[in-house]
Amino acid sequence: MKSNSQDAASIVWHPQLVTKQARNQSNGHKSRMIWFTGLSGSGKSTIANAVQAELFKRGIQVYVLDGDNLRHGLNADLSFSMEDRKENIRRTAEVGKLFVDAGLVVLAALISPVEEERQRARSRFAEDEFLEVYVSCTLQECEKRDPKGLYKKARKGEIPQFTGIHQPYEEPKNPDICIDTTDRTVEQSVQIILPIILEKIAWKEGEQ
């Protein structure tokens, strides 16, 4: 019986006639992976969706990969164990890479608590294709917000292995963008992040 490595060695990558560069040129902007990381309740998904709306208004091809949404389908078979969290990030990075190759700006919003796994996700992209956005917020504020009631359930022991309560969150060592949402509104956060993303994707007002 062949090993997985032997099977993989016999698989050849099939190049496409339409390249990523051609898609970027057609779209009028560069494709990028924007990876939002932070505690539950910090505002990752809310900010990512607000940024998506602003980019979409400008005619930019954009899509949000939300961690919770992915667990309804692609990652529905995964638990919250450390090994499954790693696989969750791996799958999301691979899907995101396909979307970037297709010419999209991808906004991934996942807790992704382990620095090593975030760096592994980054390694799947070209050096200038991946931007890490650390959505910083104190645990106290996240727990106060608790929009999904998860912290309350975790404190009661109803949710094991919950990041910030039972498992640590490793802060990014050198994020491309750091935004503290403890005392900032979503709108204020978007105003800080959006210009940076527009510059990174080389989009210019009035060219669409």
Curated annotation (Swiss-Prot):
UniProt name for this protein: Probable adenylyl-sulfate kinase
Binding positions for ATP per the UniProt entry: G38, L39, S40, G41, S42, G43, K44, S45
GO biological process: hydrogen sulfide biosynthetic process; sulfate assimilation
Active site (catalytic residues): S112
Top EC class, one word: transferase
NCBIfam families, per database record: apsK, PRK03846.1
Keyword vocabulary terms for this entry: ATP-binding, Kinase, Nucleotide-binding, Phosphoprotein, Transferase
Any GO molecular function: ATP binding
Function: Catalyzes the synthesis of activated sulfate.
Family: Belongs to the APS kinase family.
Record pathway: Sulfur metabolism; hydrogen sulfide biosynthesis; sulfite from sulfate: step 2/3
EC id: 2.7.1.25
Catalytic activity: adenosine 5'-phosphosulfate + ATP = 3'-phosphoadenylyl sulfate + ADP + H(+)
